[in-house]
């Protein structure tokens, strides 16, 4: 059945979305750890003897993350995503980059490289998530599925009539209802999986602010 291919496609997209969202969150957490634990004013790279307020710096990155995930939630949860929200997300990602630059003098070269890699993973994960939101199962396949569901009763009508004549009216009606019910359920499953971010289906991805990025989850 075409609907089976649609379900498989939608399910694969959901699994990919989970993978990319996990990378996005994990990279964000790694950057937060770096801002909390890697800063060393006595680093050999700090040749100018610069100073930094660690608590103020961590509070800033926490505020950026809160705004970033709130805007990401707004974008992904919308039926029609707002391009302005996307622009704000990109700006906030830029603020994360600027925060990384502020601690660059206090990190050794290898740590700076790892920090930039985590930011790159965030950017790549973000774009993959947004592409999954905006580009879904091919329209031709979804349209074919809808056509199949609509013409199914017409095509199989004689079959159900034959069963009703041969086995009894009640049995024929029961088989027709069963077939239609199964296809309707499969179609609903496909619709629920199609957009894993809309919050409609029970299997949708939760987009609330990750508790692992909260200030109370990590101690200095």
Predicted regions mapped to residue ranges:
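Juxtamembrane membrane-water interface segments immediately C-terminal to a transmembrane helix
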Residues: 14-25
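Structured inter-helical modules in multipass membrane proteins
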Residues: 31-141
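Cytosolic juxtamembrane regulatory segments of multi-pass membrane proteins
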Residues: 29-43, 209-220
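Alpha-helical transmembrane anchor segments
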Residues: 2-8, 131-220
């Amino acid at each position: 059945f075409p609907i089976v291919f649609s379900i498989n496609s939608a399910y694969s997209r959901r699994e990919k979305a989970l993978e990319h969202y996990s990378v996005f969150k994990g990279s964000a957490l790694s950057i937060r750890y770096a801002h909390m634990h890697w800063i060393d004013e006595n680093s050999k790279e700090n040749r100018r003897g610069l100073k930094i307020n660690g608590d103020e710096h961590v509070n800033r990155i926490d505020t950026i993350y809160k705004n970033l995930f709130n805007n990401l939630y707004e974008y992904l949860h919308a039926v029609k995503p707002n391009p302005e929200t996307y622009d704000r997300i990109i700006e906030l990602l830029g603020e994360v980059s600027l925060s990384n630059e502020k601690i660059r003098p206090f990190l050794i070269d290898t740590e700076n490289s790892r920090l930039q890699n985590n930011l790159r993973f965030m950017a790549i994960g973000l774009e993959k998530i947004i592409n999954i939101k905006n580009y879904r199962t091919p329209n031709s396949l979804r349209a074919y599925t809808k056509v199949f569901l609509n013409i199914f009763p017409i095509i199989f009508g004689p079959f159900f009539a034959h069963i009703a004549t041969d086995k009894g009216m009640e049995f024929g009606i029961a088989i027709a209802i069963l077939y239609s019910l199964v296809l309707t359920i499969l179609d609903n499953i496909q619709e629920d999986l199609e957009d894993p971010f809309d919050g409609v289906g029970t299997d949708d991805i939760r987009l609330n602010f990750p508790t692992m990025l909260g200030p109370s989850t990590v101690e200095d």
